[in-house]
C-alpha cells in the first residue's frame, strides 16, 4: 500500500488517474484518494476492457471514448496488453477523446521494451526478463506458459534482498530444471550463497547450482541447455543490465 500512496501523490486535484488491474484493497484506497481530490479514475477491467484470447496475436480494447480493434504488440508477454490498454486510456484522458485508430495500431507495433521477455539468442533460446518482485515474477511465469508451452527452463537468477525472494523463487521453480543462482552488481543483491540456501529449501526445488558471477552462470546454462530447454535470466533488472553489459563486447557468454 505504501507504493500506492507514493504513486498516487502525483494525481492532481480535479485530474484523472488511469490504473491497471488492482486487487480489492488497493482499488478501494485509490478510489478514496481520487474522491478526496475530486479526480476521476479509470481502471482496467472496469472502464477499460480487453477482448482477447491470450493465445491469439491480436486483441481489441474498449474505452469510454472508443473501440480499438485488431491491435497487435510485437513485444512478448501477455501482461503487456494490459500495459498498452492503460497507456491508451491515459492518452485518451490527456487529449479528452478518442485517438486515431491507425496511429494507435502503428504505435503499438513500434513498441520495444528491453529486458522484458527479451530474446537475445535462439541457439539456445535465451530470454532476459527483469521481473523483480513477486507479482512481476508470477505474471512473467504465466506468460512463459503461453509462450513456451511445455519447454523447460534453465534459470539464471539473482534477486534483491527487499523484493520477496522466497515468493519469487516459489513462482519460478516449478518451470525450471535447474536454477543457476548468482549475484548482481547492486549492493542490495542477495549474496549468491544465501539465495542458493533459500532455493535449496523450496518444497519442489529443481537442481540448484551456485555461481556468484552472472556471466559464468549464464555460460554454464548455455552449455547444459538442450534443444527443448530455454535459458531464462530473471529476478532483477540489475542482473539483466549486468548480463547485457557483459555481452556487448563478447556476444556469446
Describe every region a protein language model picked out.
Residues 2, 64-178:
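Nucleotide phosphate-binding/pyrophosphate-handling subdomain across enzymes
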Residues 20-42, 53, 58, 125-127, ...:
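C-terminal helical cap/extension that packs against the catalytic core
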Residues 94-95, 144, 199, 203, ...:
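Active-site catalytic pocket residues across diverse enzymes, especially alpha/beta-hydrolases
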Residues 236:
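Active-site-proximal loop/hinge segments that shape catalytic or ion-binding/gating pockets
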Residues 1-70, 84, 88-102:
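Acidic, Mg2+-coordinating active-site environments of NTP-dependent enzymes
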Amino acid at each position: 500500500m505504501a507504493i500506492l500512496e507514493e504513486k498516487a501523490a502525483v494525481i492532481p486535484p480535479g485530474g484523472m488517474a488511469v490504473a491497471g488491474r488492482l486487487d480489492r484493497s488497493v482499488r478501494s484506497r485509490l478510489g478514496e484518494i481520487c474522491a478526496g481530490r475530486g479526480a476521476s479514475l479509470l481502471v482496467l477491467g472496469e472502464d477499460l476492457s480487453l477482448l482477447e484470447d491470450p493465445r491469439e496475436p491480436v486483441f481489441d480494447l474498449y474505452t469510454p471514448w472508443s473501440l480499438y480493434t485488431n491491435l497487435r504488440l510485437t513485444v512478448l508477454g501477455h501482461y503487456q496488453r494490459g500495459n498498452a490498454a492503460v497507456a491508451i486510456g491515459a492518452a485518451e484522458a490527456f487529449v479528452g477523446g478518442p485517438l486515431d485508430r491507425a496511429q494507435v495500431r502503428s504505435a503499438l507495433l513500434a513498441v520495444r521494451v528491453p529486458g522484458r521477455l527479451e530474446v537475445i539468442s535462439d541457439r539456445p533460446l535465451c530470454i532476459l526478463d527483469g521481473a523483480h518482485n513477486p507479482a512481476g515474477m508470477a505474471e512473467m511465469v504465466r506468460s512463459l506458459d503461453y509462450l513456451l508451452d511445455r519447454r523447460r527452463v534453465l534459470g539464471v537468477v539473482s534477486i534483491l534482498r527487499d523484493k520477496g525472494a522466497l515468493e519469487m523463487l516459489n513462482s519460478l521453480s516449478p518451470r525450471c530444471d535447474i536454477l543457476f543462482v548468482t549475484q548482481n552488481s547492486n549492493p542490495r543483491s542477495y549474496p549468491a550463497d544465501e539465495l542458493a540456501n533459500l532455493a535449496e529449501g523450496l518444497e519442489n526445488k529443481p537442481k540448484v547450482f551456485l555461481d556468484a558471477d552472472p556471466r559464468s552462470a549464464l555460460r554454464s546454462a548455455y552449455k547444459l541447455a538442450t534443444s527443448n530447454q530455454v535459458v531464462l535470466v530473471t529476478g532483477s533488472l540489475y542482473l539483466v543490465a549486468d548480463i547485457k553489459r557483459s555481452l556487448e563486447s563478447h556476444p556469446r557468454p
